[in-house]
């Protein structure tokens, strides 16, 4: 399902632990890392899609997490032209994402990335809250920054909330 502007509806998932760290997943067979995310199926709400993707990609269920927040708006990113499939109809030029902030409520040993026949990820780790903004593939950075900024007051201890841009004082 692609909207009239060429964006595929999608959910993004930020899972945090009690230390203010976030779940950072390694893409299967690649050297790139990202937050879990996935498309919204026809007839599915963003929350339903989030729980489905959470189970498919990470092996966690609704009982393993608690929703702390969801983004107020859809956050969009465009794909680099080299990744757009121009021969598909309709053409998808990017993703529009509803983001969810979840807190892990179970033991992390429940994480299982091998539930699906074609797993999205083959590794994961806890990282500092702002780490993903600098490490994710460049075309997703602004969306990650915006989502994490919106969730910072909920996810992080007060002293660590401010995102410092590299090379700037303050």
UniProtKB/Swiss-Prot annotation:
Gene3D superfamilies of this UniProt entry?
A: Nucleoside Triphosphate Pyrophosphohydrolase (3.90.79.10)
Instruction: Report the EC code(s) recorded for this entry.
Output: 3.6.1.-
Intervals of motif Nudix box = 38-59
Give start and end of each Nudix hydrolase domain: 6-149
The record's section on Pfam families has: NUDIX
UniProt KW keywords: Hydrolase
Task: Report the InterPro entries cross-referenced here.
Answer: Nudix_hydrolase (IPR020476), NUDIX_hydrolase-like_dom_sf (IPR015797), NUDIX_hydrolase_CS (IPR020084), NUDIX_hydrolase_dom (IPR000086), RppH (IPR022927)
The cofactors it requires, by name, are: a divalent metal cation
Q: Which BP terms does GO give this entry?
A: mRNA catabolic process
> Which PROSITE patterns does this one have?
NUDIX (PS51462), NUDIX_BOX (PS00893)
What one GO molecular function would you report for this record?
A: mRNA 5'-diphosphatase activity
Q: Provide the Gene Ontology terms for cellular component.
A: cytoplasm
Q: Which family does it belong to?
A: Belongs to the Nudix hydrolase family. RppH subfamily.
List, alphabetically, the PANTHER family matched: M7GPPPN-MRNA HYDROLASE
Its job: Accelerates the degradation of transcripts by removing pyrophosphate from the 5'-end of triphosphorylated RNA, leading to a more labile monophosphorylated state that can stimulate subsequent ribonuclease cleavage.
Which NCBIfam families does the entry link to?
PRK00714.1-1 (NF001934), PRK00714.1-3 (NF001936), PRK00714.1-4 (NF001937), PRK00714.1-5 (NF001938)
Spell out the protein name for this chain: RNA pyrophosphohydrolase
Q: Which gene encodes it?
A: rppH
